[in-house]
Amino acid sequence: MTTTGHVHFYIGTYTNPPSTSTGIARLSLNTETGELTRLDDVVVQRNPSYLTTTEHGLYTFSEMDRNEGAELAFFRGSESASLPINGDYPCHLDIKEPLLAVANYGSGNVSVFQLDRDGKPLGLLADLYVDGCGPNLERQTSPHAHQVTFLKHSHQLVVVDLGSDSVLIYDYDAQPPDFSLSQVIHLPAGSGPRHVVFNQQESTAYVVCELSETLIVLVKHQDKWLISNQTELLEGEENQQAAAAIRLSQDETFLYVSCRAQNKISVFDVSGDTPKRRAAIHCEGVFPRDFVLSHDQKWLLVANQHSNNVVSFRRNPQTGEITATGYDCEIGSPVCIVEQPL
Protein backbone atom coordinates (compact mmCIF):
# COMPACT_ATOMS: atom_id res chain seq x y z
CA MET A 1 0.00 0.00 0.00
CA THR A 2 1.34 3.43 -0.95
CA THR A 3 0.49 6.77 0.57
CA THR A 4 2.31 10.00 -0.23
CA GLY A 5 5.96 9.15 0.36
CA HIS A 6 5.21 5.91 2.20
CA VAL A 7 4.85 2.20 1.37
CA HIS A 8 3.35 -0.28 3.82
CA PHE A 9 4.44 -3.86 4.47
CA TYR A 10 3.00 -6.85 6.30
CA ILE A 11 5.40 -8.76 8.55
CA GLY A 12 4.94 -12.43 9.38
CA THR A 13 6.38 -13.53 12.72
CA TYR A 14 6.97 -16.33 15.16
CA THR A 15 4.93 -15.73 18.29
CA ASN A 16 6.29 -18.43 20.60
CA PRO A 17 8.38 -17.11 23.54
CA PRO A 18 10.76 -15.38 23.77
CA SER A 19 9.19 -13.52 20.82
CA THR A 20 7.09 -10.51 21.76
CA SER A 21 4.99 -10.70 18.59
CA THR A 22 1.31 -11.66 18.68
CA GLY A 23 0.62 -12.14 14.96
CA ILE A 24 0.97 -10.20 11.72
CA ALA A 25 2.68 -6.84 12.15
CA ARG A 26 2.67 -3.89 9.78
CA LEU A 27 5.18 -1.13 9.10
CA SER A 28 5.60 1.93 6.92
CA LEU A 29 8.63 2.77 4.76
CA ASN A 30 9.40 6.44 4.14
CA THR A 31 10.39 6.42 0.46
CA GLU A 32 12.45 9.59 0.82
CA THR A 33 14.66 8.54 3.72
CA GLY A 34 14.19 4.80 4.28
CA GLU A 35 12.87 5.35 7.80
CA LEU A 36 10.68 2.51 9.09
CA THR A 37 7.72 3.07 11.41
CA ARG A 38 5.75 0.40 13.27
CA LEU A 39 2.01 0.57 12.60
CA ASP A 40 -0.88 -1.22 14.29
CA ASP A 41 -0.76 -5.01 14.07
CA VAL A 42 -3.15 -6.54 11.55
CA VAL A 43 -4.33 -9.71 13.28
CA VAL A 44 -3.56 -11.93 16.24
CA GLN A 45 -2.43 -15.31 14.91
CA ARG A 46 -0.04 -17.91 16.28
CA ASN A 47 3.15 -18.29 14.24
CA PRO A 48 2.02 -16.66 10.96
CA SER A 49 5.42 -17.39 9.44
CA TYR A 50 4.56 -16.88 5.77
CA LEU A 51 2.16 -14.47 4.07
CA THR A 52 0.81 -13.75 0.63
CA THR A 53 -1.80 -11.36 -0.72
CA THR A 54 -4.20 -11.16 -3.65
CA GLU A 55 -6.86 -8.66 -4.64
CA HIS A 56 -9.18 -10.58 -2.32
CA GLY A 57 -7.19 -10.37 0.91
CA LEU A 58 -4.35 -11.65 3.07
CA TYR A 59 -3.47 -15.33 3.50
CA THR A 60 -1.32 -17.04 6.11
CA PHE A 61 -1.23 -20.13 8.34
CA SER A 62 -0.23 -21.13 11.84
CA GLU A 63 3.10 -22.91 11.64
CA MET A 64 2.76 -25.80 14.08
CA ASP A 65 1.96 -29.49 14.31
CA ARG A 66 -1.49 -30.45 13.02
CA ASN A 67 -2.35 -31.76 16.51
CA GLU A 68 -1.61 -28.31 17.91
CA GLY A 69 -3.93 -26.66 15.40
CA ALA A 70 -2.09 -25.98 12.14
CA GLU A 71 -4.56 -23.99 10.07
CA LEU A 72 -4.91 -21.93 6.91
CA ALA A 73 -6.19 -18.40 7.58
CA PHE A 74 -7.72 -15.73 5.33
CA PHE A 75 -8.38 -12.09 6.21
CA ARG A 76 -10.31 -9.42 4.31
CA GLY A 77 -11.10 -6.31 6.29
CA SER A 78 -13.12 -7.47 9.31
CA GLU A 79 -13.90 -10.82 7.64
CA SER A 80 -11.85 -13.93 8.35
CA ALA A 81 -11.96 -17.64 7.59
CA SER A 82 -9.85 -20.64 8.53
CA LEU A 83 -9.48 -24.31 7.65
CA PRO A 84 -7.44 -27.04 9.36
CA ILE A 85 -4.27 -28.16 7.56
CA ASN A 86 -3.67 -31.90 7.41
CA GLY A 87 0.07 -31.49 7.71
CA ASP A 88 2.80 -30.54 10.16
CA TYR A 89 4.59 -27.19 10.29
CA PRO A 90 3.36 -25.48 7.13
CA CYS A 91 6.05 -23.11 5.86
CA HIS A 92 5.00 -21.71 2.45
CA LEU A 93 1.92 -21.10 0.34
CA ASP A 94 1.06 -19.92 -3.16
CA ILE A 95 -2.12 -19.07 -5.03
CA LYS A 96 -3.32 -19.42 -8.59
CA GLU A 97 -7.05 -19.05 -8.41
CA PRO A 98 -9.08 -21.07 -7.74
CA LEU A 99 -6.25 -23.08 -6.12
CA LEU A 100 -4.12 -22.48 -3.04
CA ALA A 101 -1.22 -24.78 -2.16
CA VAL A 102 0.55 -25.15 1.20
CA ALA A 103 3.97 -26.78 1.72
CA ASN A 104 4.11 -28.70 5.00
CA TYR A 105 7.74 -28.93 6.07
CA GLY A 106 7.34 -31.34 8.97
CA SER A 107 5.20 -33.97 7.26
CA GLY A 108 6.57 -33.38 3.74
CA ASN A 109 3.19 -33.24 2.03
CA VAL A 110 1.53 -30.47 0.03
CA SER A 111 -2.08 -29.51 0.76
CA VAL A 112 -4.08 -28.04 -2.13
CA PHE A 113 -7.23 -26.08 -1.29
CA GLN A 114 -10.04 -24.65 -3.41
CA LEU A 115 -10.97 -20.96 -3.21
CA ASP A 116 -14.35 -19.47 -4.01
CA ARG A 117 -14.83 -16.57 -6.44
CA ASP A 118 -14.08 -14.10 -3.64
CA GLY A 119 -10.87 -15.82 -2.59
CA LYS A 120 -12.23 -17.54 0.52
CA PRO A 121 -10.84 -21.04 1.18
CA LEU A 122 -13.54 -23.69 0.75
CA GLY A 123 -11.88 -27.02 1.42
CA LEU A 124 -9.10 -29.49 0.68
CA LEU A 125 -8.87 -30.70 -2.92
CA ALA A 126 -5.68 -32.75 -3.02
CA ASP A 127 -2.88 -34.04 -0.82
CA LEU A 128 0.46 -34.56 -2.57
CA TYR A 129 3.32 -36.61 -1.16
CA VAL A 130 6.43 -38.23 -2.64
CA ASP A 131 8.64 -40.25 -0.31
CA GLY A 132 12.37 -39.62 -0.27
CA CYS A 133 15.41 -38.73 1.81
CA GLY A 134 18.94 -37.39 1.58
CA PRO A 135 22.37 -38.05 3.12
CA ASN A 136 22.10 -35.45 5.91
CA LEU A 137 20.99 -37.55 8.88
CA GLU A 138 19.94 -34.50 10.89
CA ARG A 139 17.85 -32.80 8.22
CA GLN A 140 17.03 -35.30 5.47
CA THR A 141 15.61 -38.50 6.91
CA SER A 142 12.26 -37.82 5.19
CA PRO A 143 10.68 -35.39 2.70
CA HIS A 144 10.45 -31.74 3.75
CA ALA A 145 8.39 -29.69 1.30
CA HIS A 146 9.72 -26.14 1.72
CA GLN A 147 8.10 -24.15 -1.09
CA VAL A 148 5.19 -24.35 -3.53
CA THR A 149 4.90 -22.28 -6.72
CA PHE A 150 2.19 -22.27 -9.37
CA LEU A 151 3.69 -21.45 -12.76
CA LYS A 152 1.99 -18.58 -14.57
CA HIS A 153 2.27 -19.85 -18.14
CA SER A 154 1.32 -23.49 -17.63
CA HIS A 155 -0.87 -25.66 -15.44
CA GLN A 156 2.02 -26.81 -13.29
CA LEU A 157 2.81 -26.75 -9.59
CA VAL A 158 6.46 -26.73 -8.48
CA VAL A 159 7.42 -28.18 -5.09
CA VAL A 160 10.89 -27.67 -3.61
CA ASP A 161 11.74 -30.52 -1.22
CA LEU A 162 14.69 -29.99 1.10
CA GLY A 163 14.52 -33.50 2.54
CA SER A 164 14.91 -35.39 -0.74
CA ASP A 165 17.19 -32.96 -2.63
CA SER A 166 14.59 -32.57 -5.34
CA VAL A 167 12.31 -30.19 -7.18
CA LEU A 168 9.03 -31.81 -8.18
CA ILE A 169 6.89 -30.66 -11.11
CA TYR A 170 3.19 -31.56 -11.10
CA ASP A 171 0.81 -31.16 -14.03
CA TYR A 172 -2.73 -30.39 -12.96
CA ASP A 173 -6.28 -29.74 -14.08
CA ALA A 174 -8.21 -27.40 -11.81
CA GLN A 175 -11.62 -28.75 -12.76
CA PRO A 176 -11.90 -31.49 -11.71
CA PRO A 177 -8.81 -31.36 -9.46
CA ASP A 178 -6.23 -33.79 -10.73
CA PHE A 179 -2.47 -33.69 -10.11
CA SER A 180 0.11 -35.92 -11.79
CA LEU A 181 3.87 -35.91 -11.20
CA SER A 182 5.53 -35.04 -14.51
CA GLN A 183 9.19 -34.55 -13.50
CA VAL A 184 11.48 -34.93 -10.52
CA ILE A 185 14.60 -32.77 -10.77
CA HIS A 186 17.31 -34.45 -8.71
CA LEU A 187 19.74 -31.92 -7.23
CA PRO A 188 23.16 -32.74 -5.73
CA ALA A 189 22.97 -35.04 -2.71
CA GLY A 190 22.87 -33.09 0.54
CA SER A 191 22.22 -29.75 -1.15
CA GLY A 192 18.89 -29.26 0.65
CA PRO A 193 16.98 -27.03 -1.79
CA ARG A 194 14.78 -24.44 -0.05
CA HIS A 195 13.25 -21.95 -2.52
CA VAL A 196 13.13 -21.31 -6.28
CA VAL A 197 12.40 -18.23 -8.38
CA PHE A 198 11.65 -18.12 -12.12
CA ASN A 199 12.26 -15.59 -14.84
CA GLN A 200 9.15 -14.11 -16.45
CA GLN A 201 9.22 -16.51 -19.40
CA GLU A 202 9.62 -19.43 -16.99
CA SER A 203 12.51 -20.74 -19.04
CA THR A 204 15.14 -20.30 -16.30
CA ALA A 205 14.90 -21.06 -12.59
CA TYR A 206 17.21 -20.23 -9.69
CA VAL A 207 17.23 -22.58 -6.70
CA VAL A 208 18.75 -21.59 -3.36
CA CYS A 209 20.03 -24.65 -1.51
CA GLU A 210 19.93 -24.23 2.24
CA LEU A 211 22.27 -27.03 3.27
CA SER A 212 25.02 -26.61 0.66
CA GLU A 213 24.63 -22.79 0.57
CA THR A 214 24.72 -22.85 -3.21
CA LEU A 215 22.75 -21.35 -6.09
CA ILE A 216 21.67 -23.84 -8.76
CA VAL A 217 20.46 -22.65 -12.17
CA LEU A 218 17.88 -24.73 -14.03
CA VAL A 219 17.02 -24.26 -17.70
CA LYS A 220 14.02 -25.60 -19.57
CA HIS A 221 14.74 -27.69 -22.66
CA GLN A 222 11.99 -29.42 -24.63
CA ASP A 223 9.55 -29.23 -21.70
CA LYS A 224 12.08 -30.70 -19.25
CA TRP A 225 14.19 -28.91 -16.66
CA LEU A 226 17.96 -29.47 -16.63
CA ILE A 227 20.70 -28.32 -14.26
CA SER A 228 22.81 -25.65 -15.95
CA ASN A 229 25.32 -24.68 -13.28
CA GLN A 230 25.99 -24.34 -9.56
CA THR A 231 27.62 -21.47 -7.67
CA GLU A 232 28.62 -20.94 -4.04
CA LEU A 233 26.64 -18.16 -2.38
CA LEU A 234 29.62 -16.79 -0.47
CA GLU A 235 33.26 -16.89 -1.51
CA GLY A 236 35.80 -18.20 0.96
CA GLU A 237 33.38 -18.70 3.87
CA GLU A 238 32.57 -21.86 5.78
CA ASN A 239 29.29 -23.52 4.85
CA GLN A 240 26.91 -23.29 7.81
CA GLN A 241 23.85 -24.85 6.14
CA ALA A 242 21.51 -21.89 6.55
CA ALA A 243 20.82 -20.19 3.20
CA ALA A 244 17.27 -18.84 3.12
CA ALA A 245 15.42 -16.34 0.92
CA ILE A 246 15.92 -15.60 -2.79
CA ARG A 247 14.61 -12.73 -4.93
CA LEU A 248 15.03 -11.84 -8.62
CA SER A 249 14.84 -8.22 -9.74
CA GLN A 250 12.02 -7.29 -12.12
CA ASP A 251 14.47 -6.67 -14.96
CA GLU A 252 15.92 -10.16 -14.32
CA THR A 253 19.44 -8.75 -14.07
CA PHE A 254 20.16 -9.14 -10.36
CA LEU A 255 19.55 -11.93 -7.89
CA TYR A 256 19.67 -11.65 -4.09
CA VAL A 257 20.03 -14.48 -1.56
CA SER A 258 20.14 -14.34 2.24
CA CYS A 259 22.73 -16.32 4.18
CA ARG A 260 21.41 -16.49 7.73
CA ALA A 261 24.40 -17.84 9.67
CA GLN A 262 26.81 -15.34 8.08
CA ASN A 263 24.28 -12.46 8.36
CA LYS A 264 24.74 -11.47 4.73
CA ILE A 265 22.80 -10.77 1.56
CA SER A 266 24.64 -12.16 -1.46
CA VAL A 267 24.19 -10.21 -4.71
CA PHE A 268 24.55 -11.82 -8.16
CA ASP A 269 24.52 -10.48 -11.70
CA VAL A 270 22.44 -12.98 -13.67
CA SER A 271 22.29 -11.09 -16.97
CA GLY A 272 24.49 -13.76 -18.60
CA ASP A 273 24.39 -17.54 -18.72
CA THR A 274 26.35 -17.94 -15.48
CA PRO A 275 25.64 -16.01 -12.26
CA LYS A 276 28.43 -13.65 -11.25
CA ARG A 277 28.87 -12.84 -7.58
CA ARG A 278 28.94 -9.07 -7.14
CA ALA A 279 28.81 -8.45 -3.39
CA ALA A 280 27.95 -9.85 0.03
CA ILE A 281 26.36 -7.17 2.22
CA HIS A 282 25.87 -7.39 5.99
CA CYS A 283 22.18 -7.53 6.87
CA GLU A 284 22.48 -5.04 9.76
CA GLY A 285 21.08 -7.63 12.13
CA VAL A 286 21.20 -11.33 12.98
CA PHE A 287 19.78 -14.25 10.96
CA PRO A 288 18.16 -12.70 7.85
CA ARG A 289 15.26 -15.13 7.39
CA ASP A 290 13.49 -13.15 4.66
CA PHE A 291 13.72 -10.00 2.59
CA VAL A 292 11.71 -8.28 -0.12
CA LEU A 293 12.28 -5.93 -3.04
CA SER A 294 9.76 -3.08 -3.15
CA HIS A 295 7.50 -2.92 -6.19
CA ASP A 296 9.39 0.14 -7.48
CA GLN A 297 12.66 -1.84 -7.06
CA LYS A 298 14.28 1.06 -5.16
CA TRP A 299 14.24 -0.55 -1.73
CA LEU A 300 15.16 -3.84 -0.09
CA LEU A 301 13.81 -4.67 3.37
CA VAL A 302 15.33 -7.46 5.48
CA ALA A 303 13.65 -9.40 8.31
CA ASN A 304 16.35 -10.34 10.84
CA GLN A 305 14.77 -13.07 12.94
CA HIS A 306 17.22 -13.30 15.84
CA SER A 307 17.90 -9.58 16.30
CA ASN A 308 14.15 -8.84 16.15
CA ASN A 309 14.37 -6.07 13.60
CA VAL A 310 13.45 -5.14 10.04
CA VAL A 311 16.09 -3.08 8.22
CA SER A 312 15.83 -0.91 5.10
CA PHE A 313 18.36 -0.75 2.27
CA ARG A 314 18.31 1.69 -0.60
CA ARG A 315 18.70 -0.09 -3.95
CA ASN A 316 20.16 1.17 -7.22
CA PRO A 317 18.03 -0.47 -9.96
CA GLN A 318 20.77 0.08 -12.57
CA THR A 319 23.69 -1.46 -10.67
CA GLY A 320 21.81 -3.72 -8.25
CA GLU A 321 23.81 -2.25 -5.36
CA ILE A 322 22.13 -2.09 -1.96
CA THR A 323 23.12 0.38 0.77
CA ALA A 324 21.94 0.36 4.38
CA THR A 325 19.96 3.46 5.32
CA GLY A 326 20.68 3.19 9.04
CA TYR A 327 16.99 2.78 9.82
CA ASP A 328 15.37 -0.25 11.37
CA CYS A 329 12.15 -1.18 13.15
CA GLU A 330 11.85 -3.48 16.17
CA ILE A 331 9.56 -6.48 15.61
CA GLY A 332 9.73 -9.76 17.52
CA SER A 333 11.00 -12.69 15.42
CA PRO A 334 10.19 -11.29 11.95
CA VAL A 335 10.36 -14.06 9.34
CA CYS A 336 8.38 -12.86 6.28
CA ILE A 337 7.85 -9.53 4.51
CA VAL A 338 5.16 -8.75 1.93
CA GLU A 339 4.37 -5.36 0.44
CA GLN A 340 0.78 -4.35 1.16
CA PRO A 341 -1.22 -3.98 -2.08
CA LEU A 342 -2.80 -0.68 -3.05
What is the meaning of each model-derived region?
Residues T15-S19, M64-E68, G106-N109, S164-S166, ...:
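Short glycine/acidic-enriched loop and turn motifs that connect beta-strands
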Residues Q45-H56, N86-L99, D131-S154, L187-E202, ...:
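Beta-rich, blade/repeat-based domains predominating
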Residues T37-E97:
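Blade-loop segments of beta-propeller domains
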Residues T37-V43, E79-P84, A126, C133-E138, ...:
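A short beta-strand motif characteristic of beta-propeller blades
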Residues H8-Y10, T15, L83-I85, H92-I95, ...:
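Structural preference for solvent-exposed beta-strand-turn elements
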Residues S154-E213:
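Loop-centered beta-sheet repeat module
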Residues L27-G34, F113-L122, D171-P177, L218-W225, ...:
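Short loop/turn segments immediately following beta-strands, especially the blade-tip
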